[in-house]
Amino acid sequence: MLLCLLYFTSSWCSGSDVPDVCTNSGMIAINFVDGPVRGVTDRILNTLDELGVKATFSFTVNQKAVGNVGQLYRRAVEEGHNVALRVDPSMDEGYQCLSQDALENNVDREIDTIDGLSGTEIRYAAVPICNGQVNSEMYNILTERGVLPVGYTFCPYDYDDPVGEFESMIEGSDPKHHSFIILMHDGQEADTSRLENMVKIGKDKGYRFVNMDECLQGYKGAPGDPELSLRGKGVESIGKGFLPFFLMMLVRLL
């Protein structure tokens, strides 16, 4: 229990709801976080191309000078994937020590940097998640800039048998009614067989693997929250709501 525990830091355990499923059923969106990783992220991109599926890469900007990975930011975009921002991991536990101005300046710098590296206006971010929520202060900073923090339905590293658990979840679902956002880490997928197996399981059940733009098309915010307006041109202004995963499963059981 594992890398995803990073996403359950106590200082983030109350705040604002974020989407953990897609706005429409029948989709699976994989969000690769904490890359790019030299020799791994490029292999993942090759595999996704061979499988004919799209995904999202929540890249950090502190990797840009490490291992000559700068070209991977643009490559991901050019191949039809979304590039998102993994907000500086060093702030996961120490953000409380920063002033509001310092937090905003740091986020602005990171957004400007990843925009330049990717050649696009990023619209999504990965920050620590706890019980489907992110810290309200960070949520407000990001959404005021047109960037949406994204949650997840399933993280394979939480289980001893990740592919088996994923298969059980998919087999117990219905593409006509369900969708999923999957959190994965570039650095844990050097052997792409797990990714390949998960894509096969999802496709065999009738799901499509999509980038975050398609997954969250028309998303305007959690019920009761102010309507969001995301930056860039990738999200259409269609008024659709979203139902958190646990509510979807409850409806299915009734």
Curated annotation (Swiss-Prot):
Segments forming domain NodB homology: 26-210
PROSITE patterns for this protein: NODB
GO biological process: carbohydrate metabolic process; fungal-type cell wall biogenesis
Residues that span the membrane, as ranges: none
Short name of one Pfam family: Polysacc_deac_1
CDD domains recorded: CE4_NodB_like_6s_7s
Lineage top rank: taxon: Eukaryota
GO molecular function, one term: chitin deacetylase activity
InterPro entries documented for this protein: Glyco_hydro/deAcase_b/a-brl (IPR011330), NODB_dom (IPR002509), Polysacc_deacetylase_ArnD (IPR050248)
Protein name as catalogued: Polysaccharide deacetylase domain-containing protein ECU11_0510
Taxon lineage: Eukaryota, Fungi, Fungi incertae sedis, Microsporidia, Unikaryonidae
